[in-house]
């Protein structure tokens, strides 16, 4: 009877999801409620976790709860610490969920809500969550090694060194981009800075509480942490309103850069149980709580999707970003569907904290589904805004114009209704002087969230509050990826340096830790600082590579997963990784080729550089440059980006080729050839999941 009722529940979930998808598909140009997207997404996630992740766990990788994990085996109180699965879920989710799921879907909305929705859902089920889960499994079975070191073990020394260099370079770009977004969000924002700063002492208290004061009392410390977090958010508004207090928490971009660099260094060196894990767990309360609250708000308000299902910009002529739907939609959405950055966390901090191998499914697959839900919420928030306002916020000023009248005229010509009064009223409602050309996706997400939440709590008078709350939410959301990413980067760099000097590979060595951390922080910190002081320098030079390099890293991780399955003699299930690997290789290599060699200056770095050079030769200055000197800087940036794109293509192709060779060898072998650490049974005591 219980089994029958269980099947009936899942049949009901499937039918509800099918009905939601049918409602979306049969809209025929009519506006529909955003709640159907939310319902469809939740049904997909529930079914995928219950059935597909269970299939992978039991058949493909065959998780073993009696096998000792690296956290239990090497429990050193620093990097290897058996951690309660709910705390670890919070840490892992906070670490992987950065800017991508917030910003990518917002930018993808220029093509309509349908393409983005379909890729976010299909991508996470069959690619993103699969990658995170399988890489976590592989690393856990190999003493928690980093991605590059895993490639070196399973594919060979040459591809391993290539992967180590390539992955670390991509990691530096990703961390610098994420850090720049945090700096921009917190500059001259005492409310946001105070609240983010307050999470540090709260996390330290939580770490000490669960390790020494009340070990294992996760429920207690969760309640305490949540109350303190809410108090810090509420008091942050008082800090903002007080001239005396605001002065203590108001920093320039340069000051915040140095603070962030210092924090990243400290967070990477301190024991993981003391700051990083509890702070990420704490941040997850706000992250998941806000997203769930937004979902409930959508169910209550049932706002209309004002963006069309498909816009005319699917042809690649969009003003927000250039490029055809294939392959650039998949590159733009990035982390909401699949992210290479996640593989660095799944092979970095998380496998060193996993208390039982069976929890890899909940943490690896489950946390990625949660991040995808964040992406769906971001897409919905962007699509409930009037399309005219959306394009006015996200298109560059050089295309739009600078006055409300000019912007309204330009956007109206694109086929979207917009008046100057709509722009001024929206800016006034959210407490901004202007919303024109607020590119990057984050302000648009904040406006969309405010439009939904103010209808649930507070009315029009609370519009500005919810807007600024959303900006704070985004900053805290992204910062957790910076500190965890720095620690993962330290592990990667130690593996890389250990290739040449084995002593530097020892994670328990303080000198090795300090050296690798200093080098990692210096790498992303340099690009961050230069990007803050120079709008055309530092990470601003490499920003266009963020999406494509991230997806290329995912392709490398999935190649590794495919090779390991063949070497484990699980080739009958290898389609689980082969399909997403092939798709990502096709997408990323096509996008990389077009970014280098396409003839369209709006797409190709080289074509854009040639266009600017021709204009400069005639003495003309083209936007966004304001002088011939700036034109030369942009031309230089284009050549740097083209060279790095070509380098990343070579890295991905070489890893793919070595992967094919490894698969052929594995098929010829009679016995499994994967290089797992020898099996050791889990100790009988102490009890697992103690929360330490």
Each language-model region and where it sits:
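Loop-to-transmembrane helix boundary motifs in multi-pass membrane proteins
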Residues: 154-172, 364-373, 439-441, 459-470, ...
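Extracellular loop-to-transmembrane helix junctions
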Residues: 31-50, 108-138, 148, 191-203, ...
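Membrane-interface "cap" regions at the ends of multi-pass membrane proteins
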Residues: 1-15, 47-101, 284, 324, ...
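Extracellular/periplasmic helix-exit of transmembrane alpha-helices
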Residues: 298-314, 369-448, 484, 529-534
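Membrane-interface helix-loop-helix modules in multi-pass membrane proteins
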Residues: 22-28, 33, 79-142, 153-157, ...
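Membrane-interface loop-to-helix entry segments
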Residues: 35-43, 47, 53-60, 166, ...
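Transmembrane helix-loop junctions in multi-pass membrane proteins
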Residues: 18-31, 100-102, 114, 172-188, ...
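Flexible loop linkers connecting adjacent transmembrane helices
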Residues: 53-81, 107, 117, 121, ...
